[in-house]
């Protein structure tokens, strides 16, 4: 099943919250998730000239703002993070940013998807060409929910998977290797455990 780029939000079996972002791609498979600094993970093309072929393939996919983690499939990562930094409540920052940026104006009207995570709360959101939704999500140990740009752009308990792994690295590998979803390219995880732990693959 091909669902394109997607987010996985949940808790490890030990009860630590996490979000993983995975790039799955048919058109631009030569990309990598790179930790840019203590607060940022970016999706970058392996060949820099590819950056000019499509405006949607290079972006920050993770931003940490204080005790808040933002993960998305595009440049709205920075917009959401900036609004939170300015003091907007998480729900409002998500709503404003998704409505302002809107879906991607490519051949597929690709949705923008987002997760905002703290130690105690989690939100998922998306905007498509026909819908926008923000929802606070209750997390349970050992369970996770996925939100994707194709075939699974919904926030529902029906999109649940069990994720194994105790560390950010193990969770990232699990999501990268998850065979149900095709065309894995790269992934990044934020795990909330004694602060934030970042991992990429």
UniProtKB/Swiss-Prot annotation:
What's its EC? 3.5.4.10
| Record-given protein name | IMP cyclohydrolase
A Pfam family this chain is assigned to: IMP_cyclohyd
The GO terms this record gives for MF are:
IMP cyclohydrolase activity
Gene Ontology biological process: 'de novo' IMP biosynthetic process
**InterPro entries documented for this protein:** IMP_cyclohydrolase, IMP_cyclohydrolase-like, IMP_cyclohydrolase-like_sf
Supply the SUPFAM superfamilies for this chain: Archaeal IMP cyclohydrolase PurO
Any idea which UniProt keywords this protein has? Hydrolase, Purine biosynthesis
Task: Indicate whether Hydrolase appears among the record's keywords.
Answer: yes
Q: Which reaction does it catalyse?
A: IMP + H2O = 5-formamido-1-(5-phospho-D-ribosyl)imidazole-4-carboxamide
Per the entry, what this protein does is: Catalyzes the cyclization of 5-formylamidoimidazole-4-carboxamide ribonucleotide to IMP.
Q: Which HAMAP family match?
A: IMP_cyclohydrol
Domain of life per record: Archaea
The gene that this protein is the product of is purO
Which pathway does UniProt place it in? Purine metabolism; IMP biosynthesis via de novo pathway; IMP from 5-formamido-1-(5-phospho-D-ribosyl)imidazole-4-carboxamide: step 1/1
Please give the positions of the paired cysteines in each disulfide bond. Answer: none
The family note in this entry says:
Belongs to the archaeal IMP cyclohydrolase family.
The question of whether Hydrolase is a record keyword is answered with yes
